[in-house]
């Protein structure tokens, strides 16, 4: 089975319900996918209930809050990472996933969508696009390996020096210098 992971605070800001609804759509097309929703937050019970209500609780795992080594082990064991955030100033977790070689699907509304190119970007509310992206990565080996390899290369090249230079350049252009 393929493993699709949502890792973060299980709160309205992170859009966990979109992940569960997309999972439901994926599982109507194939049963060889399992979903992991790692984290804690005020919507945890609601997500467990939603998975049960949709009849997909047997394909979901809710391990709770993770830190440090647990996070990296979870990401390395995953085939796809999803971050359907409604509001996300930046979002470091997709970079961590990509660094582990895990293809990522992120919200176009997240800050990291501005700098990442080797991932799939969807509108957070578009569960059809999210489901299609999950299904595609899980069932298209070429796409999986491309996102795995190129995503890792991309995040391995991100350094504070490069980010600082990019921000400086942005300010210079904005100020017309």
Q: How would you label these PLM feature ranges?
A:
Residues 1-14, 20-23, 36, 148:
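Conserved donor-binding/catalytic core segment of Leloir-type glycosyltransferases
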Residues 48-66:
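Nucleotide-activated donor-binding/catalytic signature segment of Leloir-type glycosyltransferases, i.e.
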Residues 65-66, 73-78, 167:
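Short alpha-helical donor nucleotide-sugar binding micro-motif in glycosyltransferases
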Residues 86:
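Aromatic "clamp/platform" in nucleotide-sugar-dependent glycosyltransferases that forms part
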Residues 91-94, 112:
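Short glycine/serine-rich donor-binding loops of glycosyltransferases
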Residues 103-106:
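Short hydrophobic beta-strand element within catalytic cores of glycosyltransferases
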Residues 119-128, 136-141:
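Conserved acidic donor-binding segment of nucleotide-sugar-dependent glycosyltransferases
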Residues 142-172, 176:
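A charged, aromatic-enriched C-terminal amphipathic alpha-helix characteristic of glycosyltransferases
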């Amino acid at each position: 089975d393929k493993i699709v992971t949502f890792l973060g605070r299980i709160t309205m800001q992170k859009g966990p319900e979109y992940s569960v609804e997309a999972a439901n759509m994926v599982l109507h097309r194939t049963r060889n996918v399992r979903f992991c929703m790692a984290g804690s937050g005020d919507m945890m019970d609601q997500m467990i209930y939603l998975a049960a209500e949709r009849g997909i609780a047997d394909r979901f795992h809710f391990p709770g809050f993770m830190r440090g080594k647990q996070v990296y082990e979870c990401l390395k064991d995953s085939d796809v990472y999803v971050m359907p955030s409604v509001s996300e100033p930046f979002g470091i977790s997709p970079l961590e996933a990509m660094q582990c070689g895990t293809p990522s699907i992120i919200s176009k509304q997240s800050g990291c969508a501005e700098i990442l190119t080797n991932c799939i970007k969807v509108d957070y509310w578009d569960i059809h696009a999210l489901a299609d992206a999950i299904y595609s990565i899980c069932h298209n080996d070429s796409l999986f390996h491309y996102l795995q390899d190129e995503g890792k290369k991309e995040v391995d090249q991100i350094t504070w020096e490069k980010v600082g230079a990019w921000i400086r350049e942005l300010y210079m252009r904005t100020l017309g210098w």
